[in-house]
Swiss-Prot record:
Name the UniProt record assigns to this protein: Homoserine kinase
EC id: 2.7.1.39
GO BP of this protein: threonine biosynthetic process
Subcellular locations according to the entry: Cytoplasm
Pathway assigned to this chain's UniProt record: Amino-acid biosynthesis; L-threonine biosynthesis; L-threonine from L-aspartate: step 4/5
UniProt main location, coarse: cytoplasm
Keyword list, A-Z: Amino-acid biosynthesis, ATP-binding, Cytoplasm, Kinase, Nucleotide-binding, Threonine biosynthesis, Transferase
Length: 308
């Protein structure tokens, strides 16, 4: 029988944003970034209360359909505990539907909050599994759970009945590497952006991406001078250019100037990885074009503070 947690127990979760793919690593590479959502979760005597401040305020649901709430419930079930009621307060800094892992961060925050309330019975691998299940792929969620950069993959059981297993290992990123995000003022639908991808690619393009993905793992760890080459891609970004023309224009413009720029996740955010600051004139041009400029560091793992 599940243990009922005491009323008044509270946790505060701080979860980082993430950038997925990093160019060639489609649904594989992820990077945690120093832009954070904070979620406070308290056990109450009955019902459900949800508040949202910041990004998504007035747009996100305030009931059990909120992704954080769904993830909390999944985490509580996995930990074999239950609660009479919940109060959930979300302070969001991660832009919604911009390719910065906002939905993965919500899932991670919920599972991590439940884990903290239950006394941390779930290890990192289980938190990655539960939070990735909401996404269907682990690159963003694993980065937010584990911090730094991750190489992630999905194992499909041969019996066809067991749920997919989402796995990840971390890459310790060279401390010289920083990130600059150029965030457009419009949303991108992950599903819509995925629909433009072909069902098949050439062996030549597959080989190209395998090599660049390998280069990227080395670039992140020890050789940041290889970031430009390591962010080259032929599997997804060329096909998405027509549906994200502003993003494609800026990625090409930056890469032509030697910057390791790529489409972050499903977009529309443009991400630049660098060891030297991006030219201020370029950033001013981006601002004048309506892009929000965010200077970011590589982030550590999600953190959970038990308040009571």
């Amino acid at each position: 029988m599940a243990i009922e947690l005491p009323v008044g127990k509270k946790v505060t979760v701080t979860v980082p944003a993430s950038s997925a793919n990093l160019g060639p690593g489609f649904d594989t590479l992820g990077l945690a970034l120093s832009l954070y959502d904070t979620v406070e979760v308290e056990v109450t005597d009955h019902g459900l209360e949800v508040e949202v401040f910041g990004e998504g305020q007035g747009e996100l649901p305030l009931d059990g359909s909120h992704l954080v709430v769904k993830a909390i419930r999944a985490g509580l079930k996995a930990a074999d505990v239950q609660v009479p009621g919940l109060r959930v307060v979300c302070h969001n800094n991660i832009p919604q539907s911009r390719g910065l892992g906002s939905s993965a961060a919500a899932a991670v925050a919920g599972v991590a909050a439940a884990n903290g309330l239950a006394g941390f019975p779930l290890d990192d691998a289980r938190v990655v599994q539960l939070s990735s299940a909401f996404e269907g792929h682990p690159d963003n969620a694993a980065a937010s759970v584990l911090g730094n950069a991750v190489v992630s993959w999905t194992e499909i059981p041969v019996d066809g009945r067991t749920e997919p297993q989402f796995k990840a290992v971390t890459i310790n990123v060279d401390s010289r590497i920083k990130a600059t995000a150029l965030v457009p003022d419009f949303h991108a639908s992950t599903e819509a952006v995925r629909r433009v991808l072909p069902s098949d690619v050439t062996h030549l393009d597959a080989r190209f991406n395998v090599s660049r993905c390998a280069v990227m793992t080395v670039a992140l760890q020890h050789h940041p001078e290889l970031l430009w080459e390591g962010t080259r891609d032929r599997l997804h970004q060329p096909y998405r250019a027509d549906v994200l023309p502003v993003t494609a224009e800026w990625v090409n413009r930056l890469r032509n100037r030697g910057y390791a720029a790529y489409l972050s996740g499903a977009g529309p955010t443009i991400m630049v990885l660098h060891t030297e600051p991006v030219d201020e004139a370029v950033l001013n041009d981006a601002r004048e074009a309506g892009l929000r400029v965010l200077s970011l560091d590589v982030a550590d793992a999600v953190s959970v503070k038990v308040d009571a």
